[in-house]
Amino acid sequence: AFSCCLFTWTAKSGWHCKNIEIPNESGILCVLGSGSKEFNPNYERYCTSANSGASRNVFHCFIDTLFNTTDPACGGPPQLVGIYRKPGTNAANFGIIYNKKRYLLGMELPDGVTYDTIEWRNELFEIADGSTKKKAHSAASQPDPFRRK
């Protein structure tokens, strides 16, 4: 079982821990940062889609917000961490294929590295091949009907 705690700190009151409830279906734990002003209303729009309750819905909204943001503090390659709700699993970092380049935790990975130990996703949250940078042959399509760009 997972638990989540948001730690904050201020000079006046020091550290504070707020327990975050983990949803029963795929969803958001918390939205932080200046980009939340654009993400939150966009997520309300995405929650009306047939994909509501699926992790790809959250990712589609994140990518759509990132690609269309007016906030100069937001941008760059997306970073993705996932939590599987299956017994005996851990959280995982995902590689992202973004603008035909490979990224892991926001850092571009060079050519010539072994990519098969990383689980890859493309901008549509489709399972991708880290070597070819294309959707994996066996991957299901994950169209984003609300994508603005």
Residues covered by each model-derived region:
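N-terminal nucleophile
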Residues: 1-149
